Design a protein with these regions (language model features):
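Midchain, well-structured core segments that form catalytic/ion-binding scaffolds
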Residues: 1-143
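Zn-dependent metallopeptidase/amidohydrolase metal-coordination segment
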Residues: 114, 121-137, 141, 190-255
């Protein structure tokens, strides 16, 4: 849906700002979940050029809103001056590396499927950015239906991180699960759906991390299908689940299990 990621926009803001004013970053914070597109990101920094910062923020906000017209056009860059303070700041070299990282770390769709029209094959999202006493940490979620593509993208982020002197840790990896052209289970589920609702279901391949991949990896040749209720604004802070749809899915699943028992 061409949603903007606040962590990536922060990299753009800080990179552009250094051309307008001197500043020293105290801390960065954005996002709570690595698989949710970050809606807010905050930076604290010291500067003597408050007016220049305000002017630049307004200019960049206007540019970004224009770029995201129709998809995420209410983006806001808010500047608050807190007065004179004394604080620890990042070393200039560390600050430069972090801005470089945010500007260059991959985000969004990296490759579309070559076999299924309109399906995203590989994507990534930098969903968390936070500062502790002696480090700045970024966390990205990588998804792909092709394991080698997933690993290649992971390597790219690792290389960027390590090149800048950081450490990269890979965790929570789940297996890719490729679309199966012939699926008796899927055929049975379509049959049950038609019997219940008098119409064909819309069977699609989606770009998501699912438990099916874990079972598929452990059980060679497993035929599996994922189903679920209607959801909107998935992987954003506005994500919602339809309760009435959940009830329908439950009743449908019961019927599918009964049909498989026959």
């Amino acid at each position: 849906k061409n949603r903007a990621n606040a962590n990536k926009l922060m990299g753009r803001f800080l990179y552009g700002l250094k051309k307008k004013a001197d500043y020293a970053v105290i801390s960065l914070a954005g996002g709570q979940k690595d698989n949710a597109i970050t809606r807010e990101c905050t930076v604290e920094f010291l500067t003597d050029a408050v007016e220049d910062v305000n002017t630049y923020a307004k200019e960049l906000q206007s540019q970004i809103r224009e770029e995201y017209t129709g998809s995420d056009e209410n983006i806001t860059i808010e500047v608050k001056a807190e007065g004179t303070v004394t604080s620890q700041v990042l070393h200039p070299t560390s600050q430069e590396k972090i801005v470089f990282y945010l500007q260059n770390v991959p985000f969004g769709i990296q490759k579309m499927s070559g076999t299924i029209k309109g399906l995203v094959e590989t994507s990534t999202n930098i969903g968390i950015l936070k500062t502790s006493e002696n480090e700045v940490m970024g966390s990205s979620s990588i998804r792909s239906s092709v394991e080698t593509a997933r690993d290649s993208l992971s390597d790219k982020i690792a290389y960027l991180t390590e090149f800048l002197g950081g450490e990269y840790e890979r965790q929570g990896v789940y297996p890719a699960w490729e679309y199966r052209k012939d699926s008796p289970l899927r055929d049975k589920m379509v049959e049950v759906y038609e019997e219940m609702y008098g119409q064909k279901p819309n069977v699609v391949a989606i770009h998501a991390g699912l438990e099916c991949g874990l079972f598929y990896k452990k059980m060679e040749g497993l035929d599996c299908v994922s189903l679920g209720p209607d959801m909107k604004d998935i992987h954003t802070s506005e994500e919602v689940l339809s309760i009435s749809s959940t009830e329908r899915v439950w009743k449908y699943l019961v019927k599918v299990l009964e049909a498989l028992k026959e």
